[in-house]
From Swiss-Prot:
Family listed: Belongs to the metallo-beta-lactamase superfamily. Glyoxalase II family.
Gene transcribed to yield this protein: lactb2
Cofactor note: Binds 2 Zn(2+) ions per subunit.
EC number: 3.1.27.-
Function as written in the Swiss-Prot or TrEMBL entry: Endoribonuclease; cleaves preferentially 3' to purine-pyrimidine dinucleotide motifs in single-stranded RNA. The cleavage product contains a free 3' -OH group. Has no activity with double-stranded RNA or DNA. Required for normal mitochondrial function and cell viability.
GO molecular function, one term: zinc ion binding
GO-annotated cellular components: mitochondrial matrix
Full protein name: Endoribonuclease LACTB2
Residues binding Zn(2+) 2, per UniProt: 81-82, 164, 199
Residues that bind Zn(2+) 1: 77, 79, 145, 164
Record bears the keyword Transmembrane: no
UniProt cross-references to Gene3D superfamilies, sorted A to Z: Ribonuclease Z/Hydroxyacylglutathione hydrolase-like (3.60.15.10), Winged helix-like DNA-binding domain superfamily/Winged helix DNA-binding domain (1.10.10.10)
Keywords: Endonuclease, Hydrolase, Metal-binding, Mitochondrion, Nuclease, RNA-binding, Zinc
Length: 289
């Protein structure tokens, strides 16, 4: 168990973390939101969940402590523990009417609304640069966790705000394993010094953590394949496989684990290493080797 994350903490000369006050099995101690820059107006990365008054209190306190206001809100992806608080921030703070709230578009494109739909997202592109006093942020399209996921490179620190692509502890869930693995390789190529994750503590050895994620996913794929190879005459449902492959994982996390396992199975199916068993009312997989 990692150390308790304070509600507000200055992590560097240009980064202040404000905890989202929304702890849970998937959010760990809560969503990390970050005030970035050194001036009287700063960028807020991620906005926590909707209707969490404790977060609004913490954000107000952080802005007061650093004598600053919000210039621009950037959300790393569409999940509600990162976008939900936008509406509350707009409602509780005397923000500029022109305040931009930005993200990457969904793929395929779909309509996205903020609260009562009076404000629209401003869409960014891979490689875009956002500047504020004391900080330069470069957009990195990193799909996999979601189709619209971005990380942000803080150029002055060679640090990455990783959203939910990489967590401070444990491993991440994803929607598309192929895209996710490509995104990990992309982040590895950045050669960042540290990672400011969407959940959990700061990662100080970025390269090692990213390597760890890549190795873990490859090992998990091999583990799934080994179970099917060792039981070559048997077909398994995904829920049956979870109990074997994730036997060391707490049971309350098995649903999230099954989500990841299904993506591994789809990849293995595409690779021709496994096949779907015939004659069953539910999907069952078996080795094709």
């Amino acid at each position: 168990m990692s150390a308790v994350i304070p509600r507000i903490e200055q992590l560097s000369a240009r980064v202040v973390r404000v905890l989202g006050c929304n702890p849970g099995p998937m959010t760990l101690q809560g969503t990390n939101t970050y005030l970035v820059g050194t001036g009287r107006r700063r960028v807020l990365i991620d906005a926590g969940e909707r209707a969490v008054p404790e977060y609004i209190v913490s954000l107000r306190e952080a802005l007061k402590q650093h004598d600053t206001s919000i210039q621009h809100i950037i959300v790393t992806h569409w999940h509600h523990d990162h976008t939900g608080g936008v509406q509350d921030i707009l409602a509780h703070f005397n923000t500029d009417a022109e305040l931009r709230v930005s993200k990457l578009p969904r793929c395929p494109p779909q309509e996205e609304i903020i609260g009562d739909d009076k404000k629209k997202y401003s869409y960014l592109n891979d490689g875009d640069v956002i500047q504020t006093e004391g900080a330069t942020l470069r957009v990195l399209f990193t799909p996999g966790h979601t189709d619209d996921h971005m990380a942000l490179l803080l150029e002055e620190e060679q640090a990455v705000f990783s959203g939910d692509c990489i967590l401070g502890e444990g491993t991440a869930v994803f929607e598309d394993l192929h895209d996710y693995m490509k995104s990990l390789q992309k982040l590895l190529s950045i050669k960042a010094d540290l990672i400011y994750p969407g959940h959990g503590p700061v990662v100080h050895d970025a390269g090692s953590k990213i390597h760890e994620y890549i190795i873990h996913r490859n090992a998990r794929e091999q583990q799934i394949l080994n179970v099917l190879l060792e039981n070559s005459g048997t077909a398994f449902t995904s829920s049956e496989l979870v109990k074997v492959v994730y036997k060391e994982t707490p049971e309350h996390l098995h649903r999230a684990a099954e989500f990841n396992l299904l993506h591994h199975l789809r990849k293995l199916l595409k690779d021709g290493k496994i096949c779907l068993a015939e004659g069953s009312d539910e999907k069952k997989w078996k080795s094709n080797l």
